[in-house]
């Protein structure tokens, strides 16, 4: 290898070292599977919602209840970007599981925050120039970590 070729190769290696790699695991799919596993491990019955079901990702029920639709929102690092419409009307009573994978910060296990949308409606943050979207910070949902009892 020539000196010029070695310099080019070292430039490529240095560039790769400089760039931080993001996880190649799609957060949405990972979150849904993790929530499903957590629910089954806690004694719930659960199934993935069909492709035509809008507004929810899983159906969950305990032994004596009817199926309850839940939304799963997953990120590698907070905040979660959400629609304002998720917190009003019929969706206000829906339960959302916010999943924080934490891959970029070397967190070894995901964190689950289980909350009814209406409880976060007043904490939803929306920049002045945004109309339909806003975000939920990790501090807003900390109180609801592992709040699986809400689904019983």
Language-model region placement:
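Mixed-charge (Asp/Glu-Lys/Arg
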Residues: 1-54, 59-152
């Amino acid at each position: 290898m020539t000196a010029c070729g070695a310099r080019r190769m070292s430039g490529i290696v240095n560039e790769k070292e400089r760039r931080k790699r993001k996880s190649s695991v799609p957060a949405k799919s990972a979150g849904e599977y993790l929530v499903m596993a957590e629910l089954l491990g806690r004694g719930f019955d659960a199934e993935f919602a069909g492709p035509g079901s809008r507004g929810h990702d899983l159906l969950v029920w305990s032994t004596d209840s009817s199926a309850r639709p839940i939304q799963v929102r997953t990120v590698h690092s907070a905040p979660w970007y959400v629609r304002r419409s998720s917190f009003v009307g019929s969706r206000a009573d829906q339960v959302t599981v916010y999943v924080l994978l934490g891959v970029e910060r070397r967190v070894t296990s995901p964190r689950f925050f289980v909350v009814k949308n209406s409880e976060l409606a007043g904490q939803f943050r929306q920049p002045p120039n945004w109309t339909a979207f806003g975000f939920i910070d990790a501090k807003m949902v900390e109180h609801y970590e592992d709040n699986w009892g809400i689904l019983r």
